[in-house]
Amino acid sequence: MLDLARLDQLQNASVLVIGDVMLDRYFIGDTNRISPEAPVPVVRVAHTEDRAGGAANVARNIAHLDGQAAILGIIGNDTDGRLLKDLLIKEKVHSELLELDDARTISKTRIISRHQQMVRLDMEDTFPVAQAESVKQRYAELIEQYNTVIISDYAKGTLACVGDLIQAARKAGKQVLVDPKSKDFSLYRGATVITPNLSEFKAAGGDASSDDAMLSSARAMLTDAGIDTMLLTRSEQGMSLITPTEHHHFPAEVLEVSDVTGAGDTVIATLGTLLSAGFDLKDAAWLSNLAAGIVVAKLGAATVSPEELAARASHQWSAKTSGYHPSVEQSLLHIDYARQQGERIVFTNGCFDILHAGHVRYLAQARALGDRLVVGLNSDASVRRLKGEERPVNSLEDRMEVLSALACVDWVIPFGDNTVENDTPEQLIKRVNPQVLAKGGDYSIDTIVGADFVQENGGEVAILPTVEGRSTTGLIKKVRG
């Protein structure tokens, strides 16, 4: 079972990042008029901000997670290079940046107004292949000091010897994670994990026309390139962790998108830090997905702290973020993950129109039968068919929010669309596949919907007593006088 308390112990992670470093510069201000010189908006700059970018952003993400981070890359002997070094020192990143007299530090300047990026200005050189040899030599001297290597490829020349770097790390017993830029994934042969986004996956020949096609082509790519695992980032579709024999999908966990800049850096930094600290690959991927959801709600190339990650993980684990209700598919994925972690899933259902003490006591009893409680909740249309035209008193959204606030409830999933046949939770029970099916009232097991399915699959059915004198109908009559 995933222990979130371990997120307080990431100081044990030691990660060497090697790749193309750059300086991210932001000009931020307001826009309220069009220039008289050309049909373009005028931004009145209120403030500027400089941040470590590219591979250096990966390193700073590791440092903000409390991991030990080092960055190896190339900069120019210039003002931006010195500024980048100073930024990394402030963020507690050990920098091994090789200076070139005849090159300039890569920088990307973004003009931002009202949380929108309006234009980006790139100033960059591609470093000569000969300099990659200098990087390779310093890498050989550093590699023994770290247990995980992250290769952050932006195709600027730092990683011209990438194959040699990977082989040296694997020979030394290190995990190697690669954020690829090349269309030829075989350049990263021997990597432990590769983390392409959907565009990079397609550019490398991946087929994303369907989930089955994606899995098939991803596995073929892993086999052809000699790579162990792929963590495919799929934007609003979440992430997919794929090996030659298994796969896991993690739905996107984003409440608000402000800026996607650097989200891929956060993913590989979080994954590398957690793997370095001894986390299971699947747990590390799930948490990396949550980290991406946190960072895209921030402006620019941002970072995530262990406290933010732990808080988001605990919220998403039981879907209790205020005002947030995951989709049915998201909830089912969370439930499946909990079951894989050895947790006992309990299911019950009802209308729960006006929540009262009888409901609360019953739900607490149901939760006590296992580790996680799933509540199937009749839709408004379903309640109306079952209880009459004046019901429900409270809308589905309100009922979901009230139930989700209870400590004993982990997931609330609505059911019962526009047909009478769906007024029972039978199909939902089959999808949840609980170890325990709980029902309150004077029932016999053979009259409980879904009981036969649960028992056939090794589960049990529990009939719980109701609280005398407590009912929604009684409350409504009492209010009406």
UniProtKB/Swiss-Prot annotation:
InterPro entries assigned to the protein according to its UniProt record, in alphabetical order: Bifunc_HldE, Cyt_trans-like, PfkB_dom, RfaE_dom_I, RfaE_dom_II, Ribokinase-like, Rossmann-like_a/b/a_fold
Pfam families: CTP_transf_like (PF01467), PfkB (PF00294)
Broad enzyme group: transferase
SUPFAM superfamilies given in the database record: Nucleotidylyl transferase, Ribokinase-like
Active site residues per record: 265
UniProt xrefs under CDD domains: RfaE_like
Binding site for ATP: 197-200
GO cellular component, one term: cytosol
Region: Cytidylyltransferase, residue numbers: 347-481
Chemical reaction(s) catalysed: D-glycero-beta-D-manno-heptose 7-phosphate + ATP = D-glycero-beta-D-manno-heptose 1,7-bisphosphate + ADP + H(+); D-glycero-beta-D-manno-heptose 1-phosphate + ATP + H(+) = ADP-D-glycero-beta-D-manno-heptose + diphosphate
A GO biological process held by the record: ADP-L-glycero-beta-D-manno-heptose biosynthetic process
Keywords: ATP-binding, Carbohydrate metabolism, Kinase, Multifunctional enzyme, Nucleotide-binding, Nucleotidyltransferase, Transferase
Disulfide-linked positions: none
Known function: Catalyzes the ADP transfer from ATP to D-glycero-beta-D-manno-heptose 1-phosphate, yielding ADP-D-glycero-beta-D-manno-heptose.
Family to which this protein belongs: In the N-terminal section; belongs to the carbohydrate kinase PfkB family. In the C-terminal section; belongs to the cytidylyltransferase family.
Subunit annotation: Homodimer.
Name assigned to this protein: Bifunctional protein HldE
